[in-house]
From Swiss-Prot:
Family: Belongs to the aldolase class II family. AraD/FucA subfamily.
Protein residues bound to substrate: G24, N25, T39, G40, T66, S67
Source organism of this protein record: Methanococcus maripaludis (strain C7 / ATCC BAA-1331)
Keywords: Lyase, Metal-binding, Zinc
Top-level taxon of origin: Archaea
SUPFAM superfamilies assigned: AraD/HMP-PK domain-like (SSF53639)
Entry's EC annotation: 4.1.2.17
Pathway connected to this protein: Cofactor biosynthesis; coenzyme F420 biosynthesis
Protein name: L-fuculose phosphate aldolase
One Pfam family cited in the UniProt record for this chain: Aldolase_II
Name of the encoding gene: fucA
Higher taxonomy: Archaea, Methanobacteriati, Methanobacteriota, Methanomada group, Methanococci
The reaction(s) this protein catalyses: L-fuculose 1-phosphate = (S)-lactaldehyde + dihydroxyacetone phosphate
């Protein structure tokens, strides 16, 4: 299990302001175990000892996992090919979600990395409804109304890159819309 890269990605999310304060959460799957950020954690200050462990049924092995545990579990239970999940409250994506504006994939990188974006109506944070709505999406990049984004991948780096490209696309949409 590569917790060093997991921690590095958490720090990048914080350093690049994709999360602020104790917002956002990250997980990776290793067999029947999920390594996930703890509730109330500041991703920029996270270390290996802080990471929680649960099994695929939600039984807690170590720590107190994020309140979005149900969402992570449902995604892993519904998608065998997913081994990493990144959930952020990145500013531009969240702003577009609040306005119900769809993002255009302006760059070739976005078309390759993001491909298509799913949009999920608002559900309360940590709710089973949110978990079910997100896990039913076939897309790997999901924008949550008034909440943020979820990206998934075969590994933590892939999920992170989707987060980065999705937020860049939101910024480009903002700039292009304001230059028209």
């Amino acid at each position: 299990m590569d917790l060093i890269n997991f921690i590095k990605i958490c720090h990048l999310l914080y350093d690049r302001k994709y999360v602020v304060g104790s917002g956002g959460n990250v997980s990776i799957r290793d067999g029947n175990h999920i390594y996930i950020t703890p509730t109330g954690s500041i991703l920029g200050f996270l270390n290996e000892e802080d990471v929680c462990i649960v099994d695929l049924n939600g039984n807690i092995i170590k720590g107190k996992p994020t309140s979005e545990l149900n969402m992570h579990l449902k995604i892993y239970q519904n998608k065998d090919c997913v081994n990493a999940i990144v959930h952020t409250h990145s500013m531009y994506c969240t702003a577009f979600s609040a306005l119900d504006k769809k993002l255009e994939l302006f760059t070739p990188e976005a078309e390759i990395v993001v491909k298509k974006i799913a949009y999920v109506d608002y559900s309360p944070c940590g709710s089973l409804e949110l978990a079910e709505n997100v896990s039913s999406c076939v897309e790997d990049s999901i924008i949550l109304k008034n909440h943020g984004i979820v990206t998934v991948g075969k590994d933590i780096t892939e999920a992170y890159v989707k987060t980065e490209v999705l937020e860049e696309i939101a910024q480009l949409n903002y700039i292009i819309n304001n230059l028209k």
